[in-house]
Amino acid sequence: MAEYLASIFGTEKDKVNCSFYFKIGACRHGDRCSRIHNKPTFSQTVLLQNLYVNPQNSAKSADGSHLVANVSDEEMQEHYDNFFEDVFVECEDKYGEIEEMNVCDNLGDHLVGNVYIKFRNEADAEKAANDLNNRWFGGRPVYSELSPVTDFREACCRQYEMGECTRSGFCNFMHLKPISRELRRYLYSRRRRARSRSRSPGRRRGSRSRSRSPGRRGGGRGDGVGGGNYLNNERDNMRGNDRGNDRDRRKGGGGGGGGGGGRY
């Protein structure tokens, strides 16, 4: 009997434990769910609930329905890449190596804007979960907890990945929002540079070049494009200097192309 219960744990056959919470770390029924949400005491993965605010979905009409904001695809991708980079870099620098980070593009309240950060070590994840609960982001408190999700292949909507999901943003499986190829190359090359620095202490950290339109970064405040959504602790001086150097290089080096610009 014990072997059978263990074999069905977290599956649809399990009538005691919530399979959605086990697979996705979130359930649309929340505390009203008739099945148990077994919150892990240790895990590699930290969930930051509803952290990312998509400008295209943030506007609502009087009846509460979503309105599509007038934001171009290019602006949307830049806004998202900046958000992703800031969270990824700060969490990896502060808490430890990140294996993967995923952001949900769903619209359901239990999944919208959820950020899942899978650390290499469980101790780093525990430290991050505890510390981030004392942080603010975009004028809102951060709600973090350890998540049971470690295999995102089981949590993702396969139909969405093939462009065939009929539930749109209200699907109960993860619709993951992709980052640009440029940012992906930067984050992985950054990791290689970090490992190289451990062998050569004198090397400095680089920073990804960002092509921002004049005035957009300081334009809308809050959760819109260019709204300055940063974790509300001071950045270390080195990162600030690196960004300043990037701006100087862009002024002196002329405009680059889009996509995977010539820097890499």
Swiss-Prot record:
The lineage of its organism: Eukaryota, Metazoa, Ecdysozoa, Arthropoda, Hexapoda. The keyword Calcium does not apply. The keyword Electron transport does not apply. GO terms for cellular component: nucleus; precatalytic spliceosome; spliceosomal complex; U2AF complex. Residues 253-264 have a biased composition (Gly residues). Residues 190-264 are annotated as: Disordered. The modification Phosphoserine is found at residue 19. Residues 44-149 form the RRM domain. Belongs to the splicing factor SR family. Pfam families: RRM_1, zf-CCCH. The gene is U2af38. GO terms for molecular function: mRNA binding; poly-pyrimidine tract binding; pre-mRNA 3'-splice site binding; zinc ion binding. PROSITE patterns: RRM, ZF_C3H1. PANTHER family: U2 SNRNP AUXILIARY FACTOR, SMALL SUBUNIT. Associates with a 65 kDa protein. It is found in: Nucleus. Residues 190-219 have a biased composition (Basic residues). Necessary for the splicing of pre-mRNA. Binds to the polypyrimidine tract of introns early during spliceosome assembly. Keywords: Metal-binding, mRNA processing, mRNA splicing, Nucleus, Phosphoprotein, Repeat, RNA-binding, Zinc, Zinc-finger. A zinc finger (C3H1-type) spans 12-40, 151-178. Gene3D superfamilies: 3.30.70.330. This is Splicing factor U2af 38 kDa subunit. One of its GO terms (biological process) is regulation of alternative mRNA splicing, via spliceosome. It comes from Drosophila melanogaster (Fruit fly). Residues 233-251 have a biased composition (Basic and acidic residues).
